[in-house]
Amino acid sequence: MSTHRNKLSAAALSLSVLVALTACNPAASGGSAAPSGSAGAGSFSKDLSGSLKTSGFNPSDEVGKSRSDLATKAVSPATVTMDTTNFDAQKFSAQAASGQVPDLIQVDRSIVPTLADKGLIQPLDACYSLWGVDPATQYYPAATKSVTYNGKVYGVPQFFQTSMVIADKNVMQAAGVSTDQLDTSKPDQIVAAAQKMYKASGGKPSVVGFDADLPGSADLWLQVFGGSAMDANGKPTLDAAANVTALTWMKKLMDAQGGYAAIKSFKDSMDAFGNENQYVKNEVGAQTWGQWYINVLSATKDKVSVVGVPIKTTDGKALGYAGGTALAIPTAAKNPSAACAWAIKATSLDAWKAAGDARAKTVQEKNSINTGLFTGSPAADKAVRDAHVVPSGSADFDQLISTAYSTLDTTASFGSSPAGSSIKDALSNAVAVALSGEKDPATALKDAQATALRAWQQTSAGKNG
């Protein structure tokens, strides 16, 4: 079982790869690619023609296919060719070197500022304006912020599947733990509840009391404690006092349940996506999950007893934290106009409504539960919920779904930084060494800050700031 439970984890994008990309990309180094069917970089037109090559978007399920079909039809007579494999920095480097980049790429939102800083993708403000879309209102604020760099928007966000606590009511009842004891605004109370629900057999965990998804969701917990991995400009702030407090709590939580290594080993043995998942087997008291995991659990809806709890900061404020992907247009794209039109249409209200209809049909065929779609767009989320999310016959799952929707009221994300991948990696490493006892939390974060700061100083923003 993976310790990182964001559905779409950030691609590993090393600085050396990006430097190579900048060196070999003609658009990033002052050259230009001859556009086909549109004007050049930064210029968009509704007069569509030529071929559109996309990379990273995979219409493998009904949600993706319905959106893709609608967008592909909208860009006609331009023809669409898809490379459905995930974005890969090395592959993109080779494409840039040959001058054959895709016209449209799908990437994790956290690396959009990195690509923008290196001049590898182009700002989309003119694209949005052409089609009458205001990203500030079309998408959740945190999603738009993630793809904004130096005041310009470089991506078209998709999905915002917020994190929440999903607890096993059977384990809670056996331990005498109530739902209000899982209030994350009271971190010491969480540790106490974890201790009550934790069980061991033969010196090894048999029930994890509270799994905070570490190090995968470390940044979420920094924000719970009022901290952040970076400042408003994207500069790393890993060694800030609030972050040290957060990591100290993470260590305390793990130590209260047999220690990080033992918990990780036990979690790795869990059948998280199968019919014998940890909620079926009552192997966990509570866990942090993205909204999408409700879909996984629905396959075993008759075997689990669960309750959802929203995540709050220590000052009691709701925290709807999520990552996600974005569509971006390479600077050297040959058909940016078709790419722009496709991306805007694929994330339009019409596209998400079509996706909602397609998901509803699948849910009906499988006799499953419709948990809604968390699209990244408030209007689309509401439209799909109003049309398709109805009482499921399971009070537990209705409560989970309602809780998930409630987390969208106040959105948050990792942030926007040209050194985002390096900051994320440094944080993950710091959490791992602190939880394992190799370093104390303050030292681990101090060392992580030094590593992340070096990466920041090699970005254009870092050199200029």
Show where each model-derived region lies.
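Conserved N-terminal structural module of periplasmic/extracytoplasmic solute-binding proteins
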Residues: 2-114, 350-354, 438-443, 447-465
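Short, solvent-exposed loop/beta-turn-alpha elements that line the ligand-binding surface or hinge
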Residues: 44-45, 125-139, 182-183, 206-208, ...
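Short helix-initiation/N-cap motifs at beta->coil->alpha
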Residues: 84-92, 110, 184-191, 264-277, ...
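Extracytoplasmic ligand-binding clamshell segments of periplasmic binding protein
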Residues: 89, 227-311, 444
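Short helices/loops that flank or line small-molecule/ion binding pockets
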Residues: 90-101, 118, 171-172, 191-200, ...
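Hinge/lid segment of periplasmic solute-binding proteins
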Residues: 110-162, 307-308, 465
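Helix-loop-helix "hinge/cap" segment bordering the ligand-binding cleft or interdomain interface
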Residues: 129, 148-216, 228-265, 329-337, ...
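C-terminal lobe and pocket-closing loops
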Residues: 293-303, 315-321, 329-425, 463-464
